[in-house]
Amino acid sequence: DLTRYSPADFKHETRQLLALSIPMMLGQIATVAIGVVDTAMSGAAGKDDLTAVALGSSVFSTLFITFMGIMAALNPIIAQQHGAGGTHEVGETGRQGVWFGLLLGILGMAVLFALIIPLQNYLDMSAHIKTMFARYLGIVALGLPAALIYRALHAYASSLNKPQPIMWINWAALLLNIPLNYLFIFGAAGTADLAERFQAAPALIAWLRQLPVPALGGVGAGVATTIVFWFGTFALALYLAKSRDLRRFGFTQCFSRPNWRTQKNIATLGWAIGLSYFLEASLFTFIVWLIADLGENHVAAQQIVLSLSSVIYMIPQAIGSAATVRIGYAIGRKQFARARYISGVAIVCGWILGACTLVALLVFRLPLAKIS
């Protein structure tokens, strides 16, 4: 359908797609950067800490990305209702999405807890690494319900063309993650020593030394990440409650019990998306476990590569999410030819960005390796 529209239409739709996808992309990169920061700072604590975080993060990321795909079913549903002018339906679906995220998060948390002992037994590593792995995975599991509720709120806001607040909240979460990582990985005393080295205010240094926070090593990265997940969820929920532009949808103006028919509809649409996300994510995350027997150096190196690939993956993922919203909105307005056209524009944009990413990786591969 690309040939049925003028170049001006293509330019217009590309602008609309990029206006929606770029904030999504930047926000997703900030989220992935939290994992990169965890990796880097855990490595500063020691090779064993980095290995434990790499193994735990690979398990958590695989499940989280899979469930994130299931939650992505909310985007076309809400966008289509928005396009059809269903103000009440949009708010109700948003509330049902929060319930769905909570229930899916509790299920995922139970799965992660159940996997800890079998995966510990599988690892042929030191008892210290096994213990840190178990503690890290158990702690980040507590943040999974918050992370999936956040995905429901994310889908609601982005489907209503409000991706910018999500982007700023994600970057605020990243900035919060850095000092929290210092605090929990190196302890209050270690963080105070760092603050003293950078000539921070004496009052701040004295306050840090009084905090009863021990150095948790790599496990501390899990504590910081869990706190950041809950922070992001409450921050986005507060924005949605206060936003004047979104007030007409009534998202926070009433309480809804779980509607099992709606829950089933979300799951029916989302399981295939989740499966595709799982297959894509596991191509990278499972490699950490396949090479675990080779030792800590190989695991640490793979985690660095995984962090970079995760950042790159956010580019097409953001284009796809933005296209889903645009197409769903067009379908809601019964503009089926326009919906097909938007899908074509999205594919072309994806090809171009993919080619640019490939060239950038080839040109800058050595500097990127040196940074790692």
Positions of predicted regions on the chain:
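Alpha-helical transmembrane segments and their helix-entry boundary regions
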Residues: 17, 50-51, 163-167, 218-222, ...
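Transmembrane helical elements of multi-pass membrane transporters/channels
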Residues: 19-38, 139, 150, 173, ...
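Helix-loop interface residues and adjacent transmembrane-helix termini in multi-pass membrane transporters
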Residues: 33-36, 44-47, 81-84, 159-160, ...
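Alpha-helical transmembrane segments of multi-pass membrane proteins
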Residues: 127-153, 308-310
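Small-residue-rich hydrophobic transmembrane alpha-helices
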Residues: 50-110, 147-166, 302-365
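Interhelical loop/hinge segments that connect adjacent transmembrane helices in multipass membrane
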Residues: 1-19, 198-209, 218, 225, ...
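Short membrane-interface helical motifs at transmembrane helix boundaries
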Residues: 107-138, 187-188, 195-199, 204-208, ...
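Hydrophobic alpha-helical transmembrane segments
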Residues: 136, 169-183, 188-246
